[in-house]
Regions:
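Small-residue-rich segments of transmembrane alpha-helices in multi-pass membrane proteins
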Residues: 1-7, 126-141, 188-192, 253-267
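Membrane-embedded alpha-helical segments that form the functional core of polytopic membrane enzymes
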Residues: 6, 10, 15-39, 98-106, ...
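Acidic (Asp/Glu-rich) catalytic motifs at the cytosolic membrane interface
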Residues: 28-55, 165-187
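C-terminal ends of transmembrane helices
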Residues: 37-41, 106-119, 167, 171, ...
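Multi-pass membrane catalytic core of lipid/isoprenoid biosynthesis enzymes
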Residues: 52-95, 183-218, 257-258, 263
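Intramembrane alpha-helical segments
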Residues: 57-150
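Functional transmembrane core segments of multi-pass inner-membrane proteins
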Residues: 128-175, 193-196
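Extended hydrophobic alpha-helices typical of membrane-associated regions
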Residues: 217-273
Length: 273
């Protein structure tokens, strides 16, 4: 959702100020995110990654509060509404959006299901950067302005790096459990020590890229001042990632997610100056 907010701000700054498709883009992003989350919970439950001994937050499936049948119905409902909202966006973006919309919904499933689930084969970070950063920002911007440029792709990549912070926290917390269930993540390959450094540098790189994709909107000094809160906050969260262990890391999930919102709001504020 933060990605789309950021894209809308950039599009409005460049003349793409149409609120109806902007709101529909937000709705589509929320539905796609919800679909991905529910499918991921279902997949982790089926594989055994989520169980009564898991370090992560309590899951309704594991506790028995929600049945498999209910989850499947929820997935069907979410996908159906998501598809309809996506179809409505074709009015503004053209039929070229259809294959990409279907791809987004497909990735929501392939992220944790299928013969080669992305999150189980060290491709989770790549998927997050692409489909929670580059794709939503690029196509929201395209729908509103009818153009794509390198600046907006850089903006999408930067947001993808920030959104990836949440996945890194998850994978650091579940490093031992993931190995037990043959779930291969970047933490499993490179080690938590290395990925904690990536966690620190992701938002720094994202803010650095801002000097490029915001150059037509503000001067370097304005952007340098604007990103100070983001930089301070991300360093604080990074320190906590190195300090917290086990279930303590659950407290960082919301804090890591907040980085994306802060980054998006930073862009929004600068565009309003």
């Amino acid at each position: 959702m933060a990605s789309v907010i950021m894209a809308i701000a950039l599009a409005f700054e460049n003349g793409g100020n149409n609120w109806l498709p902007a709101i529909l883009c937000l709705l589509f992003a929320m539905l796609a995110q919800a679909t991905s989350n529910v499918v991921n919970d279902y997949a982790d439950y089926k594989t055994g990654c989520d169980n009564e001994n898991s370090l992560g937050p309590d899951r309704k499936l594991v506790s028995g509060e929600v049945s498999i049948k209910t989850i499947k119905r929820a997935i069907i409902l979410l996908v159906s509404i998501c598809f309809l909202v996506g179809l409505s966006l074709i009015y503004w973006g053209g039929w070229i959006l259809l294959p990409f919309g279907l791809l987004i919904i497909t990735v929501a499933f392939c992220y944790s299901l299928g013969p080669i689930p992305l999150s189980y084969n060290a491709l989770g970070d790549v998927a997050v950067i692409l489909f929670f950063g580059i794709v939503p920002i690029t196509f929201t911007y395209y729908i509103l302005t009818k153009e794509i440029n390198w600046e907006i792709i850089a903006a999408g990549f930067s947001m993808g790096l920030v959104v990836d912070e949440l996945l890194i926290v998850n994978n650091v917390r579940d490093e031992i459990e993931d190995k037990q269930f043959n779930k291969v993540t970047t933490v499993g390959i490179f080690g938590s020590k290395f990925m904690k450094k990536v966690f620190l540098f992701n938002p720094l790189i994202a803010c650095g890229l801002g000097f490029y994709f915001m150059r037509g909107i503000c001067d370097y000094k304005t952007w340098a001042i604007a990103i100070i809160p983001m930089l301070i906050y991300s360093v604080i969260v990074s320190i906590r990632l190195n300090k917290y262990k086990g279930k303590q890391l659950n407290a960082l999930l919301g804090q890591a997610s907040l980085e994306a919102l802060i980054f998006a709001l930073t862009v929004v504020v600068v565009t309003l100056l």
